[in-house]
């Protein structure tokens, strides 16, 4: 999952996944200038916690650190450290289910204990039978919440962040795991509703409020147009990721992908055409909503920064996905130079 820090997304042609047809109108993000500092801090922390001890896990760690650097390109050093730790936790927690690292009862235990932390900010009591990996992830999560309290403009912002973690877990990670256990693929609309949340975009946007030291009111964050833009960011990341990860998931015999669901009634090329059109349509809707807000009485610098944060998270995921070795897209395409 490692990425070269100086590699940006390129324009590709004749790619079997047609990624050059996914159009985003925003400026590509570049790695945060504090990347090296944050990487050193994260490596020390994970070593202290006993995480990422084998090469595969270290490669994954380095890849996620770079991803966060693309997602939060203008964050200060401590703010980027906080955002990076949270994105790492999302990947670690997803791997509990996705790669079946724990027994079923251990997965349930990790889930229940994490939910307790989301709701209280405190870890439940430990016992001798607790899997050490669960303890490690809890320690990481508690450090993340401690940083959130230190960096957030107000306790309301911290509470909103913790609530987004709970929603990610309850409405995203757990239902997605239930889908993986099914013998048949879910309906496309059911999959999208869960995948949008499981992709973690809304949680990363809530994290951005802390990273950027914003202090938006609930009325602004919950304004229907703003909510829809946040949802679009999640949909765009989820469906684009399903395209980027398609061949990797085939190699791992993972059929839980929107393209596979579409292919139940469409050819692969038609499924890809439909999905790319939907992605580009969502971006057009996002831009229309942004223009509507810019012309409204709600428009002010903090809201503009909030929306720019959404754009950076989406664009950062695109740039990283097209340049990282996790999906190894370069091996499947002809590069335009």
Swiss-Prot record:
InterPro entries registered for this protein in UniProt: Isoprenoid_synthase_dom_sf, Terpene_cyclase-like_2
Pfam families: Terpene_syn_C_2
Motif NSE motif: positions: 241-249
Motif segment (D(D/E)XX(D/E) motif): 94-98
Residues the entry annotates as binding Mg(2+) 1: 94, 98
Keyword line: Lyase, Magnesium, Metal-binding
Binding-site residues for Mg(2+) 2, renumbered to this chain: 98
Gene3D superfamilies: Farnesyl Diphosphate Synthase
Motif annotated as WxxxxxRY motif, chain positions: 320-327
Annotated catalysed reactions: (2E,6E)-farnesyl diphosphate = alpha-muurolene + diphosphate; (2E,6E)-farnesyl diphosphate = (-)-(E)-beta-caryophyllene + diphosphate
Binding residues annotated for Mg(2+) 3, in chain numbering: 241, 245, 249
Keyword Lipid metabolism assigned: no
Entry remark concerning the domains of this protein: The 2 conserved active-site motifs D(D/E)XX(D/E) and NSE are required for coordinating the divalent metal ions that stabilize the PPi moiety of the substrate. The C-terminal WxxxxxRY motif is frequently found in terpene synthases and is important to guide product formation.
Name of the protein described by the UniProt record: Terpene synthase 4
Gene: TPS4
């Amino acid at each position: 999952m490692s990425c070269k820090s100086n590699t940006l997304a390129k324009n590709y042609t004749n790619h079997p996944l047609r990624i050059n047809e996914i159009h985003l109108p925003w400026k590509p993000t570049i790695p945060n200038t504090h990347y090296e500092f944050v990487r050193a801090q994260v490596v020390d922390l994970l070593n202290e916690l006993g995480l990422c001890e084998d090469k595969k896990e270290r490669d994954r760690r380095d890849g996620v650190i770079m991803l966060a650097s693309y997602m939060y390109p203008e964050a200060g050093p401590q703010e980027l450290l906080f955002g990076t730790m949270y994105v790492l936790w999302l990947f670690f927690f997803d791997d509990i289910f996705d790669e079946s690292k724990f027994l079923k009862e251990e997965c349930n235990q990790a889930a229940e204990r994490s939910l307790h932390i989301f709701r209280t900010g405190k870890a439940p009591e430990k016992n001798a039978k607790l899997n050490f990996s669960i303890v490690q992830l809890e320690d990481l999560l508690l450090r993340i919440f401690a940083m959130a309290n230190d960096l957030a403009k107000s306790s309301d912002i911290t509470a909103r962040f913790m609530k987004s973690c709970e929603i990610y877990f309850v409405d995203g990670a757990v239902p997605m795991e239930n889908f993986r256990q099914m013998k048949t693929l879910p309906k496309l609309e059911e999959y999208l509703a869960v995948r949008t949340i499981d992709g973690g975009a809304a949680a990363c946007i809530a994290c951005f409020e802390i990273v950027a030291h914003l202090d938006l009111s609930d009325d602004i964050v919950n304004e229907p147009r703003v909510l829809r833009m946040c949802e679009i960011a999640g949909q765009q990341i989820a469906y684009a990721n399903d395209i980027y990860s398609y061949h990797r998931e085939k190699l791992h015999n993972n059929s839980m992908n929107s393209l596979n669901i579409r292919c139940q009634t469409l050819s692969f090329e038609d499924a890809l055409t439909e999905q790319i059109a939907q992605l580009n349509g969502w971006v057009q809707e996002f831009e229309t909503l942004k223009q509507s807000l810019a012309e409204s009485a709600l428009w002010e610098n903090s809201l503009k920064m909030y929306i720019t944060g959404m754009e950076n998270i989406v664009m950062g995921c695109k740039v990283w996905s097209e340049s990282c070795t996790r999906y190894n897209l370069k091996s499947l395409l002809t590069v335009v130079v």
